[in-house]
Regions:
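Alpha/beta-hydrolase superfamily serine-hydrolase fold, recognizing
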Residues: 1-215
Length: 215
């Protein structure tokens, strides 16, 4: 298991995706040193890490995101687990009260900064609704295609930070795509609260990866 650091805001998309893919290529390039089977790679993360994991898995056929070093290695993965991660930046405010939707309808919202980068001086930036193509390109839902690896999606039905609708949309899109996908909704769980650190939840994720990555 490897924990990966990646660039976040003020660095704009696709910086974090390029970092995630380069980390995979680095590990594969050093597979013998680390005792890794580079034909059996899984990615997982929660929140922003879940978003990044989904982006890595859904863009496997898009070499434009493979930048930097170790380009003779593939950044493809064989399994993906996303835990309460965003999947569609265009609808990220769905399922929230009006006051929360007002925050997302802002040039300073985190998802707008991810797509636009930090703005300076007279540049006001853009609402995501003004740049739907860019928002779609920075969303896992914008990259669904045949041949994706198996997915495990997990979300709490009491999440106050990332709406469960985000995982609903991803699950529906993957099902329509014919992708093997499992969707687990954790009752009463909020965003990253103690529900997620229960041993049965941890065991569930470990067993899922074991079942999908064992030879």
């Amino acid at each position: 298991m490897a924990a990966v650091q990646y660039r976040t805001i003020p660095n704009a998309f696709p910086a974090l995706l390029e970092d995630g893919k380069q980390a995979i290529r680095f590990l594969k390039a050093n597979a013998e040193k680390f005792g890794i089977d580079k034909t059996r790679f899984g990615v997982m993360g929660n929140s922003a890490g879940g978003y990044l994991s989904s982006m890595i898995a859904t863009t496997m056929n898009e070499p434009c995101f493979d930048q930097g070093q170790y380009l003779d290695e593939s950044s493809d993965v064989q399994a993906c687990c996303t835990i309460f991660g965003p999947s569609d930046l265009e609808t990220i405010d769905e399922g929230f009260p009006t006051e929360v939707q007002a925050y997302h309808d802002s040039r300073a919202a985190s998802e707008a900064l991810l797509v636009n980068g930090v703005v300076y001086g007279r540049d006001p930036g853009h609402l995501l609704e003004e740049i739907p193509d860019k928002a779609r390109a920075a969303s896992p839902l914008g990259h669904i295609h045949p041949g994706l690896p198996p997915f495990l999606i997990m979300h709490g039905n009491n999440d106050h930070m990332v709406s469960q609708r985000q995982s609903d949309h991803l699950y529906e899109a993957l099902c329509e795509n014919g992708t093997e996908v499992e969707y687990v909704v954790l009752d009463k769980a909020d965003h990253g609260d103690d529900h997620w650190f229960q041993q049965p939840v941890i065991d569930y994720v470990v067993d899922w990866f074991r079942n999908h990555l064992r030879p």
